[in-house]
Amino acid sequence: MPYAAINGQNIHYTDSGGDKPALLFSHGLLMDCSMFDAQVSAFSNAYRCIAWDERGHGGTGDARENFSYYDSAADAVALLAYLGIKQAVFVGMSQGGYLSLRAALTAPHAVRAIVLLGSQADMDAPEKIPGYQAMVDAWSTHGLSEEIGSTIEHIIGGPSFDGAPWRAKWKKMSATNLHTIFNTLFTRDDLTDRLSQITAPTLVVHGTDDAAIPLVHAQKAAQGIPGAKLVVIQGGGHAANMTHAAPVNKAIAEFLA
């Protein structure tokens, strides 16, 4: 497994290689680069596919200190530079979209285009935060219960999602790391008023049944980014790229063509 020493982190990544146009896949909260296996398989013949584990996730390991999605965006841009890639299409699911938008704002030279999957530019409804915080507190204190595991599975993948492999990973997450990565989520800034500054071509893909981020948030993002296109995945949940890979891949392929 390759690693890159970047910004004080030991970033784990996968790279299909070659000198083809690059796609950089950034995963969602509590996930890792393997959530894009279906996309890497579909696109690696025509594109150089890089998928990476963000701070506090997967092979990159626990976050060493508090961080923001601007830090994650800087990690992504630095990873491209480490690999000798000047520009990539940033494909981001949920928090991967958060960092992709911030990369487009802070390092537009590195962002050829953006694909937002189950993501948003604005904030979560305030009434959601106490529930999420209580869940994190219970999880970090008592471990991953059956109830919490089932709740997370439903939020991420919907009722048909097989979350067993992910539960095994979640059970290994430390209490300190859980609080750190959720703090990053809770304290992020609202980008709504900055969307008009984004110049990269943008595709917004969102499921009708996303339990984490309602479709209206994707619609707002698509309306705010100049020229953005919205594709709605019928029956898709939060991680539609996993549960509805075929229509998601079709939307991405048509956007990239």
Locate predicted features.
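Conserved HGGG/HGGXW glycine-rich cap/lid loop of the alpha/beta-hydrolase fold
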Residues: 9-65
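Conserved acidic catalytic loop of the alpha/beta-hydrolase fold
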Residues: 70-88
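Flexible "cap/lid" loop of the alpha/beta hydrolase fold
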Residues: 98-106, 110-141
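Conserved alpha/beta-hydrolase catalytic His-Asp/Glu region
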Residues: 124-130, 142-196
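Short beta-strand/loop motif that positions the catalytic acidic residue
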Residues: 198, 204-206, 210
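Conserved alpha/beta-hydrolase "acid-adjacent" motif
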Residues: 211-217
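Catalytic histidine neighborhood in serine/cysteine hydrolases
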Residues: 219-239
